[in-house]
Amino acid sequence: MNIPFYIVDVFAEKKYAGNQLAVFLGADVLSTEEMQKIAREVNFAESTFITKFEPENSVAEIRIFTPEHEMKFAGHPIIGTSWVLMNRIFENQPEKITLSVPIGKIPVHQSGDLVWLQAAQPEFLDTFLAEDFLSFSNLSSADFDDAFPIQEVTTGSAFVIVPIKNKKALEHLILDKVKMNEWLHGHCKTNHRALYFYCLEETKLISRMLCIEDNQLKEDAATGSASTCLQAFLLKYHAEEIQIINHQGDFINRSSQIYFDGKLAENHFDIKIGGKTQFIAKGEWEV
């Protein structure tokens, strides 16, 4: 049995940048175990499996897997899968579609060469002290931007948002894997434990996402779900309206640009992230 698949680069201004994604069509014939094995074989940050789609209604259901586990929500897989559906699968090439993922329905629209998703309302969880990070990083107290808190935020997947003062500290960041993992397990209430460092330097937003997967310290080239959390954080603490590009992946040679368009009004967060997707390849997977 063969099923078609596509490979794309997401949040990429050009090919061979951004975050890689494998998209599998006709995945309703696969078991959960088979999906996990395929995701592990591909070994991208995430792979998606389209289990149902209705072109006439511009809707689809997908499942998202890292090489280790299934995700309830993740940004770059939703953006990339939507691009594939709208530009390679749906013959009518709709500008708007709805993707169903485990946390619910995600509205997606395409405007020019950008695909945008609308995120769920955020939850702001625990705050932490900068001193906590001194035990498992090379950061000093002076490297943290104390104008903002350090806080775990979720819009479906949770991230600890860590404000850093400048690009130099962000670029030269070093983390102790063992001590970081102990801290995450001891302090994060959610099962998705990851750190999202950022700095705002001369109006440029730069970020890094680091987590422990497969007992390894890993850095993500572009993290849409973390970007929705960061956008919510900036709307709450920085400005009630934001249009900016989040630059991620610069320090691992996978330059990514994640577009922010957000507003906060009467405690309602309007969080949208967008990005460009580059088509890389298509083929058939022998199951």
Predicted features along the sequence, with ranges:
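Active-site proximal loop and beta-alpha junction motif in alpha/beta enzyme cores
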Residues: 1-73, 79-287
